[in-house]
């Protein structure tokens, strides 16, 4: 089976979140299921610089204000189609936001262009590649099935994956014609969404099947509280919606081979984690205290991620004699609050505002516990990496965190299956209770090490998710 995957980022070439990890890891996992994936991504500077053996396979004379071409290329393990459109993608900043922190004003055209290219490829516009199935990811690719629907050409079945329902790609209605959509599309059963054009809504409306990245999140987004205005449509789609857990790239995330660690280890050599703990403390300016319970945070610094709750709970961390190491970037108010916390608690709280791949691995390999107090979490990869590395995840009772962490309640402790701590409600009080439970377990080395071994024994790879995606693909192509 040949699959065309369309998305706006792919690890390791360009990444702002979990979408890139999935786009980067799922194709290799699907190859074990006999499925060949080619991924279409925008030609950002970081992407075009990484290409090997790029060949122009389709020229587009005018694509939203300029000439473009689709190039077939390899980049590491990835088999790519790259939409080379310098007038849309050759810019500084990240894929969606300029260096001043403001969204690019032409994001509608930039990602409609990606969708146009995806629709062309889906219809077999490039000789030698006719996909059996289209897999579009998030709002940036949401118009692909819409274009195919309104253009009326024969097309392969489409799977549309929602990685985060909060990012919906809403744009003003006056752009309808400029985006190449007919007036008939501007209806409730089309692309119209709250008086504008909804890219994500279009994907949900026209895909043959919808997936999201955990079973729990699939349930949550069909409710009024979790649906963010789209719950009615999701309930209407009913059995077309599937929750398939994300996996983790276990070749990249492997404590036994990880070159970012000060000391590599496996489940039989957990004592080596102490070397990494000292390295985290030294790197981040924390007191070199081997006994202190070290909490790590590797996250986007945003309200969704509950970072403000961690700041509110700092007095509890003080009372526990714990340390906190934070790595991430995000909302300016949260960044400022973290800087204040660091200044008020030297040697006990540390934060590096930014992102360093090597440090993210070191924190997973050296922290005793990883905090993930999200207000909502479609799947989450941080807790998967934490368990892989024997760092106990402390997570809120939402989304994929529920599906991937086994709470250390008395039954799970007695059965010897606990892998982390879940807390609720998602509040400062709920998190504080989770912190105290974590400290109590940390004070019992036998229970703690058993939890670490349980966590590291979990299969968090892409093997099972790939099987589930393959089964869904086959169910659609066999109709």
UniProtKB/Swiss-Prot annotation:
One GO term describing the cellular component: cytosol
Keywords for the protein's UniProt record, in alphabetical order: Glycogen biosynthesis, Glycosyltransferase, Transferase
Class of enzymatic activity (EC top level): transferase
EC number(s) given by UniProt: 2.4.1.21
Binding positions (ADP-alpha-D-glucose): 15
Domain of life of the source: Bacteria
Pathway: Glycan biosynthesis; glycogen biosynthesis
Molecular function terms from GO: alpha-1,4-glucan glucosyltransferase (ADP-glucose donor) activity; alpha-1,4-glucan glucosyltransferase (UDP-glucose donor) activity
SUPFAM superfamilies according to UniProt: UDP-Glycosyltransferase/glycogen phosphorylase
Cystine residue pairs: none
Catalytic activity annotation: [(1->4)-alpha-D-glucosyl](n) + ADP-alpha-D-glucose = [(1->4)-alpha-D-glucosyl](n+1) + ADP + H(+)
Single GO BP term: glycogen biosynthetic process
Matching CDD domains: GT5_Glycogen_synthase_DULL1-like
Function comment: Synthesizes alpha-1,4-glucan chains using ADP-glucose.
PANTHER family the UniProt entry points to: ALPHA AMYLASE DOMAIN-CONTAINING PROTEIN, GRANULE-BOUND STARCH SYNTHASE 1, CHLOROPLASTIC/AMYLOPLASTIC
Family: Belongs to the glycosyltransferase 1 family. Bacterial/plant glycogen synthase subfamily.
Name of the protein described by the UniProt record: Glycogen synthase
Organism of this sequence: Acidiphilium cryptum (strain JF-5)
């Amino acid at each position: 089976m040949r699959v065309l995957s369309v998305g706006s980022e792919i690890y390791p070439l360009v990444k702002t979140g979990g979408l890139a990890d999935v786009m980067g890891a799922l194709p290799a996992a699907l190859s074990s299921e006999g499925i060949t994936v080619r991924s279409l991504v925008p030609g950002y500077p970081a992407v075009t610089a990484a290409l090997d053996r790029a060949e122009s396979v389709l020229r587009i004379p005018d694509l939203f204000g300029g000439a473009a071409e689709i190039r077939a290329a390899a980049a590491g393990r990835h088999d790519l189609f790259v939409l080379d459109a310098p007038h849309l993608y050759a810019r500084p900043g990240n894929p969606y936001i300029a260096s001043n922190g403001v969204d690019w004003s032409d994001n509608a055209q930039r990602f409609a262009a990606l969708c146009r290219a995806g629709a062309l490829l889906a219809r077999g516009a490039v000789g030698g590649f006719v996909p059996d199935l289209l897999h579009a990811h998030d709002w940036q690719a949401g118009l692909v099935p819409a274009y195919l629907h309104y253009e009326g050409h024969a097309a392969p079945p489409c799977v549309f994956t929602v990685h985060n329902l909060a990012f919906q790609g809403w744009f003003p209605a006056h752009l309808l014609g400029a985006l190449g959509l007919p007036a008939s599309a501007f209806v409730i059963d089309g692309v119209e969404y709250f008086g504008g054009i909804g890219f994500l809504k279009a994907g949900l409306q026209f895909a043959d099947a919808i997936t999201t990245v955990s079973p729990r999140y699939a349930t949550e987004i069909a409710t009024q509280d979790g649906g963010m205005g789209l719950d009615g449509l999701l309930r209407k789609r009913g059995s077309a919606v599937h929750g398939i857990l994300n996996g983790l790239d276990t070749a990249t995330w492997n404590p036994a081979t990880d070159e970012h660690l000060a000391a590599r280890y496996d489940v039989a050599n957990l004592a080596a984690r102490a070397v990494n703990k000292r390295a985290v403390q030294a790197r981040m300016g924390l007191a070199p205290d081997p006994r202190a319970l070290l909490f790590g945070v590797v996250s986007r610094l945003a309200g969704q991620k509950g970072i403000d709750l961690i700041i509110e709970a700092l007095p509890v961390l003080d009372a526990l004699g714990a340390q906190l190491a934070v790595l991430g970037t995000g909302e300016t108010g949260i960044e400022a609050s973290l800087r204040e916390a660091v200044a008020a608690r030297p040697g006990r709280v540390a934060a590096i505002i930014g992102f360093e791949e090597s440090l993210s691995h070191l924190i997973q390999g050296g922290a005793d516990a990883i905090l993930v107090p999200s207000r909502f979490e479609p799947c989450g990869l941080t807790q998967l990496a934490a368990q892989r590395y024997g760092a106990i995840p402390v997570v809120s009772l939402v989304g994929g965190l529920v599906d991937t962490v086994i709470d250390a309640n008395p039954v799970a402790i007695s059965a010897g299956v606990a892998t982390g701590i879940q807390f609720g409600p998602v509040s400062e009080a709920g998190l504080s209770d989770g912190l105290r439970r974590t400290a109590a377990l940390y004070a019992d080395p036998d229970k703690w090490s058993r939890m670490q071994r349980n966590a590291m024994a979990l299969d968090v790879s892409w093997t099972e998710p790939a099987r589930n995606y393959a089964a869904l693909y086959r169910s659609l192509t066999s109709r």
